[in-house]
Curated annotation (Swiss-Prot):
It comes from Cyriopagopus hainanus (Chinese bird spider). This is Hainantoxin F6-34.84. Its main location: secreted. Belongs to the AVIT (prokineticin) family. One of its GO terms (cellular component) is extracellular region.
């Protein structure tokens, strides 16, 4: 599950912002 204002990416990352393809980050980035 992703944080607030984030969406799941098919590659298992969380995306924030509108340009999801440019803002993908790994889950739980410390």
């Amino acid at each position: 599950e992703c944080w607030s204002q984030a969406a799941d990416c098919s590659d298992g990352h969380c995306c924030a912002g509108r340009s999801f393809s440019k803002n993908c980050r790994p889950y739980g980035g410390d």
